[in-house]
């Protein structure tokens, strides 16, 4: 995989989480209520927002990329299963598949590493497995 491909993948994957996390800051209590409606304790709203924003930023700049990618990938799959698994609702199932696809993309990124255009490359972390 080329370094430009890895950079593009990091940017595209990260933007979703950075924007989504920052958007949740506009109504944290509403987001906490949404989480609670899915059976997830409302007090986890802040850690989820932090994971989305900080994990997204880490992936974007290529810092601790493998860890951040695994965290966001696992989060994507778990959130999809908790909030979007509804076989009676085609849109929710599409959202589930989107989350599963994100999980797959992050798994690939965790395996490939951040590439040369990343903080990890500057600090001597392996760019590829």
Where are these regions (language model features)?
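Flexible, solvent-exposed coil segments and beta strand-coil junctions
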Residues: 38-39
């Amino acid at each position: 995989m080329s370094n430009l491909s890895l950079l593009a993948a990091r940017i595209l994957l990260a933007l979703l989480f950075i924007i989504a996390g920052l958007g949740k800051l506009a109504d944290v209590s509403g987001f906490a209520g949404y989480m609670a409606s899915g059976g997830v304790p409302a007090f986890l709203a802040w850690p989820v927002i932090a994971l989305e924003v900080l994990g997204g930023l880490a992936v974007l700049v290529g810092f601790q990329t493998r860890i951040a990618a695994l965290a966001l990938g696992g989060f994507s799959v778990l959130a999809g299963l908790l909030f979007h698994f509804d076989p009676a609702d085609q849109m929710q199932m599409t959202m589930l598949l989107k989350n599963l696809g994100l999980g797959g993309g992050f798994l690939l990124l965790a395996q490939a590493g951040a590439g040369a255009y990343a903080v990890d490359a500057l600090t001597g972390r392996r760019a590829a497995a």
